[in-house]
């Protein structure tokens, strides 16, 4: 196992070497900022590829971890994979699925390497900036890179448990949620790097108006977190086609549903906690809750985008957020009516990751605008006070 892990680590280093080389040889003013955004891009790709892995039932394409039948890649395990496929032709193990699963693991480990590089550079800059003013030194604070490092390690652990616990729904759903959380943290950090280089200087709203935008953006992010959990639960329980019409489900607005078994977290895939087969009404409950909570999220996030659209500094992000919401609604409905086509299902997962990206950016931008509005008001008040003093007769 140790040899396999070492061989996979070397593969991950080689995969990570390409983006690292592109970053450090670029003419970008801030190579570190570019590294962060390249990692954001690759993490988004990993989430989409992870959805493809899950939707093609490739999660157990290599039923051990970290390698594939004890080997570092499917080439070295070809005989074992072919033998497993011959024993169960309709099972989860095929050469194609083995490669899908291992590519997913290689890319995940490469992103881990990029985050380690980010962390090392952040600590290096932090130590070098010891003699700078406290405010300037805070720019290099390595808190977020440290959180990213622990998050990617935890994500790797859940990736392993996804395989070793045979696609336990709660483990797979948590793995998906952690991936989205990692993306959000990376986007927040990327926005912070942008802010350090080109600070926001254009004030577009008063503090009360921007406070309302911040509240709406925060609420939308909280609702999105719940919806991501529900979407992951729907996918990992294979409940996508429990309702095959919209807005009705089984010919009813509120069909018969089994919430108790549907939302029991710790159980095997397709089974109740007692080990019986999961009733169809439980799958209906899972799908119905995800669908209707999605409509609630669309209304709240759509209203947030509309309010943010009225401020120039937030307009671009608000526009993309609104378009992504429409994409999600369209792909969600299309998934039902087109009998769950793979391309649409992957696109729906990509849309969820884009919602994470745009809402994280909107929250950060609203925060910066709010702080700028407060600072502008404070400066204006100070100038007014000095003006009154200057006009006071001596």
Question: Model-derived features: where do they sit?
Answer:
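Membrane-interfacial alpha-helical segments at the cytosolic side of multi-pass membrane proteins
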Residues: 109-126, 181-194, 296-309, 356-367
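Membrane-interface helix-loop-helix junctions at transmembrane boundaries of multi-pass membrane enzymes
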Residues: 31, 120-146, 305-321
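Membrane-interfacial, low-structure loops and terminal tails that flank and connect transmembrane helices
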Residues: 31, 126-142, 195-213, 369-394
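Interfacial segments of alpha-helical transmembrane regions
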Residues: 29-45, 141-148, 204-229, 314-321
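Transmembrane alpha-helices
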Residues: 1-29
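Extracytosolic (periplasmic/ER-lumenal) interhelical loops and adjacent juxtamembrane/interface segments
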Residues: 55-102, 240-283
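Membrane-interface loop-to-helix entry segments
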Residues: 2-10, 99-117, 169-182, 285-303, ...
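Interfacial helix-loop-helix junctions of multi-pass membrane proteins
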Residues: 52-62, 150-176, 233-245, 329-353
């Amino acid at each position: 196992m140790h040899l396999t892990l070492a061989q996979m680590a070397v593969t991950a280093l080689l995969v990570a070497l390409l983006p690292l080389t592109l970053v450090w040889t670029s003419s970008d003013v801030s190579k570190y900022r570019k590294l962060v955004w390249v990692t954001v891009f690759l993490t988004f790709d990993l989430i989409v590829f992870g959805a493809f892995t899950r939707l093609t039932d490739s999660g157990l394409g290599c039923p051990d971890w970290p390698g594939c039948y004890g080997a570092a890649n499917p080439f070295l395990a070809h005989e074992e994979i072919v033998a497993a496929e011959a024993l169960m032709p309709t099972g989860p193990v095929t050469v194609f699925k083995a490669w899908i699963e291992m590519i997913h693991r290689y890319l995940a480990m490469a992103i881990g390497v990029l985050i380690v590089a980010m962390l090392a550079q952040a600590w290096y800059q932090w130590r070098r900036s010891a003699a700078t003013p406290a405010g300037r030194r805070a720019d290099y604070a390595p808190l977020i890179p440290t959180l990213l490092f622990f998050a990617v390690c935890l994500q790797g652990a859940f990736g392993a448990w996804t395989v070793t616990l045979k696609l336990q729904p709660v483990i797979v759903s948590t793995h998906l949620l952690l991936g989205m959380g990692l993306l959000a943290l990376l986007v927040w950090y990327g926005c912070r790097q942008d802010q350090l280089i080109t600070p926001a200087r254009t004030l577009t709203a008063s503090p009360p108006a921007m406070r309302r935008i911040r509240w709406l953006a925060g609420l939308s992010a909280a609702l999105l977190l719940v919806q991501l959990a529900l979407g992951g639960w729907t996918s990992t329980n294979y409940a996508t086609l429990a309702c095959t019409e919209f807005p009705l489900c089984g010919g009813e607005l509120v069909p018969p549903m089994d919430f108790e078994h549907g939302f029991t977290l710790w159980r095997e895939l397709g089974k109740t906690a007692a080990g019986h087969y999961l009733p169809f009404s439980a799958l209906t409950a899972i799908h119905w809750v995800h669908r209707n909570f999605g409509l609630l999220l669309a209304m709240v996030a759509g209203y947030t985008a509309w309010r943010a659209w009225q401020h120039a500094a937030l307009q671009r992000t608000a526009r993309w957020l609104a378009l992504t919401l429409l994409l999600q609604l369209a792909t969600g409905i299309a998934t039902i009516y087109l009998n769950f086509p793979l391309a649409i299902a992957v696109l729906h997962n990509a849309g969820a990751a884009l919602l994470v990206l745009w809402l994280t950016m909107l929250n950060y931008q609203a925060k910066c605008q709010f702080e700028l509005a407060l600072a502008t008001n404070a400066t204006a008040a100070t100038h007014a006070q000095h003006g009154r003093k200057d006009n006071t007769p001596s």
